[in-house]
Every structure is written in structure tokens, then in C-alpha cells.
Amino acid sequence: GLNMENWKKDSRKDIVMVDVDALVPPDHLLRKVERVMDYDWLYERLSPYYCADNGRPGTDPVVLIKMVLIQHLFGIASLRQTHREIQVNIAYRWFLGYSLLDEIPHFATVSYAFCKRFPPELSEEIFAHILNKALNNRMVDPSMIFIDGTHIKASANKKKLQKEQVAKAAKVYEEQLRKEVSEERKKLGKKVNDDDDDENKGSSGGGTVEKTVSKTDPDCGMFVKGAHERQFAYEAHTACDKHGFVLGVEVTAGNVSDSAAWDAVYDQVTNSFPEVKFVTMDAGYKTPWIAKKVLEHSRIPILPYTRYKGKKDKFKPWDFIYDAATDSFTCPRGHELRHTTTSKEGKRTYRSSPKICKDCPCRTVCGANESGQRILTTHIWQEYLDLVEHLRKTERGKELYAMRKETIERVFADAKEKHAMRYTHHRGLARVSAWVRLKYAAMNLKKIAIWKWNASNFASYIMIFAPFNDKTPVLVV
């Protein structure tokens, strides 16, 4: 029957003899992680930063790195909170190799080690080591990559700002575009711009532009989130494979466009994985330069449909037929638009004759200007965008673009919902970049650990039940 006295029994001060290992569930995530991680390389890498025969005894550097891994694996917002969680969590203590009574290293010790003692490139090395572990286990398929960017809210008050005049940033492809434009202008008999060799001028003509700068964290950028919402942020431009393994990341200020930061992350991934065949991106990357660069590298860019932004009741650009032999367009009424000039931004201009257009019955729907002239502009690298449009309509193109939601978008969703990447407490581009890389390293490590755990369990299942079923396939783990 019911015994109320048993319910009131207080066992909180009972003395129990038990080892920490027995208290951690056999399928706990940290057990899975511990099975796949190796730390010898970390001791070897960090040994020059510690003195063996002088000074006070230091904290084990691997313990400090494990504390940061715990923070990112379980989405704990800060190191201070991580320290509190480890104090009372038996599994966390087990992962660090500590008993129930051992004192946990102070969070300031961890922070100081990463800021002052450890080498700045340690986060990149940890990320690369974990990614190599996935490659060695043949878990990564770099033949197709997915690139996108996500914003991370900065630790900066959006009301504490100032306006600054900064030089326009030169584009990566500026020199190549300038050469091609100069050659084309010479063929057209046009003057080559005198400022082409001015190193102080950007691709849009040089000069400066006004920029909103945070007084708290000057490295972040003002990101326009919606019609009325603005905030300081960073952006993590990320590349992953079809399984969701992060292959590379480049962190920039939040006001840097996707296409401007694309070259850094693309070069980073393709240098590490030359076997990349398909590159899938969203509309923010649909530019002539990106299409040209990917296609010239014998890779296939997969980009989405973008809606035409002109007037609905006017002739569309595709209503005009291009003749490569004469380098001209023909309008729906059969009249010619001649190539007149090419701007230094790479825009070709085709113009019709005002004498013909003046009396044309289609003038109202043609889109001609007030002087009765129809002007059509295309980019000097338009042929690459046209090929991208063709690839988009193929079955393979539709299939790969649909995979974005379960690959790169899933990476961002998990990073923000499960691993606390929605906002950062760090300030400065270098510290935020290291923070993002460690977070992605933890996500890759989690995937490796779970996959290997599931594979070993499945192999055990096969070994037990194979004698009873001759048709059971053999799994090599």
C-alpha cells in the first residue's frame, strides 16, 4: 500500500561509493564523441606554449579545448554559463576526465588561453583536423557543394554608431574586367578611360562611400533585416556538402553582399577539394562574374530563376534577337539595334535609330525613351548567365537546387537553433571568425560521432542476426 513516510525520505546527503563512468549513460553524445576524438596532436601542437620546468602548474590545454567543445556541442550561450553547467553535469565532468569533486577551470582561464596563449590559427586547425577525420571515414562527398550566407547578430548597440567615409572596395575581378572592356572599347573606336590605371579607384569609378560604423564593434556591419529593422551583424559565408558537413567558411561584416564574399569561400573549398563538380547557390550569387568563374573551372553552377524587374507591358530583353555576326540585336519589328559603347562596368549598350523608331507603331510597348530611341544593355559576360539559365532548367539543375533546403539551410537552422549561433558575445572579426569555425567544427564532430556510433551498432546487429538469415548483407565498417 501507500507509505507516505517513504515519499518523505531525503537521500540528498547519503554517501554513495560510485565511479563517474557508471553514472554516464552508454549512449550519451559525449561518449560517442570521445570514441572518435584523438588529442595527441593537440598536445604536440601546444607544447611550445607551455614550460615544462618553470612556473606554476598549468591547466591541461586539452581540457580547455574540451570545455569550448561542450559549449558549442550543446549550444551554451557563453563560457561563463558553460562553466556553471560543467560544475553540476556529471557527463560533462566525465568528458573532461574530472571526478565529482575536482575543481573546474575558471571560464576566464579558457578565454585567456584562446585569446593570448594559443596560436591564432588553432581554431582553423581544429576545424581542418575534424573535417579530415570525416574525409578519412569517407563520410564527405565534395563532388557537389552548396554555398550560402547567414547573419549573426553582433554584440553591439545599434544606437551607438557613427558615419564614416571609406574607400570603395575593389572587386576581385576588377583587373580582368578592365582589360576586356579596354579591348572592346578599342575595337569600337572609343577612348579608353584615363583612370583605368589609377590604383586608388574602385570598379565603380573610385572615390569614397559613406558607411555606418559601430562605436562598440567597428568590424561588424549594419544589416538591413526588413523594411524597418536594422541591426549590426556579421555574416558567415558557408559551404557544405550534400550530407551537411561544413567544408569552409568565411566571416565578414554583415553589410558585405553574398557575391562580394563569394570568391574567398569558393577558392578555399575548391583548393581543398579540386573534385568539386556542382556548385549550388541562391539568387544572391547570380552575377556574371560568378557564372563565368565557375564555368571556366569546368564546374556546373546551379542558380535559381530570378524575376524580370522591368515593366510588364513593354517588350522584354528576350524579345530582341541577337546576331553574333554583326554584334547587334533585332527588335520584334525587324529593326536593328547597333552596339554603340561598352562602359567600364562591363555593360554593353545597343541603340536603335531614332529616325526609324519615331514612326514605329510599336513605340508605346517598345520601351523607347523620349527621343524615340530604344536602348538595350547586356553585360560583357552575359553568355555565361545565359548558359546558367539553360542549366537551371535541366532535371539535374532542379534536383540539386531543391537540395538546398536539406543541406545548407539545414546547417544554418541547426547552428542557430541547436548550437547558439543566432548571436555572438565576441567582438572583432578575428574572434568572431574563430568562434564560428569552432562551432562548425563541433557540428561536424557531432555528425561523425553519431554516424560512427550508428554504424558500429548496425554492424553488431548484423553479427548477431546474420546466422539466422542467409540473405542479410554483409556490412564493412
PLM feature segments, named:
Residues W7-D10, R56-G58, Y98-L100:
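A short, ordered amphipathic alpha-helix with a cationic face
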Residues Y92-L96:
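Short amphipathic alpha-helical interface patches used for protein-protein assembly/oligomerization
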Residues N6-W7, G75-V88, L100-V477:
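Anion-binding and metal-coordination hotspots
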Residues G1-N3:
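Short, Lys/Arg-enriched N-terminal segments with co-localized hydrophobic residues
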